Amino acid sequence: MIIHQSHPEPLSGNKAYTAVTIAYEPERIPTILTGGCQCGAVRYRADAVLDSSHICHCRMCQKAVGNFFAALIGIPRDAFQWTRGAPTLFKSSDPVTRGFCAKCGTPLLYDYATSKHLNVTTGSLDNPAAFPPRGQFGSEGRMSWFGDLSQIADEGTTEETMAEFAPAIKASNHQHPDHDTDDWRA
């Protein structure tokens, strides 16, 4: 993946993210995938993806997903449909609209207006492990410790690290399952 980033000179010590140009046409991969929000009020389906799974470290993406980076995958517009509900939309810049579930807050969508595709958050996929990142950009916002993640101590599973709370959380789980359902109590 060849990516070109353009940044202006720092203003008041901050670098501003201005443009990202992907210097190739991502390959369209026919596949069926589904996904949606945590509560199940918003669901989607796609009949193809692009080989563009990536993470973006820019500050705007960090704010949009409430995390250190956004994990996204491109989907051709003609292959995508909302199957239950629709996200609430927020215009984060003139060309970009982001979508999230109004009920549970799950970030779902990054939509650049003039693009032939849209991006969904990889974490909202029913099988996110199937689409590991193939690239990253927005490096001006990347956390300085990002490269050290694999060196952080692994404390164990939820059941091991939260043994006192895990059974009650599991027994009262309101999260939508990782597959389509005919209906849901969202």
Where are these regions (language model features)?
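A short Gly-Trp-Pro
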Residues: 2-34, 41-186
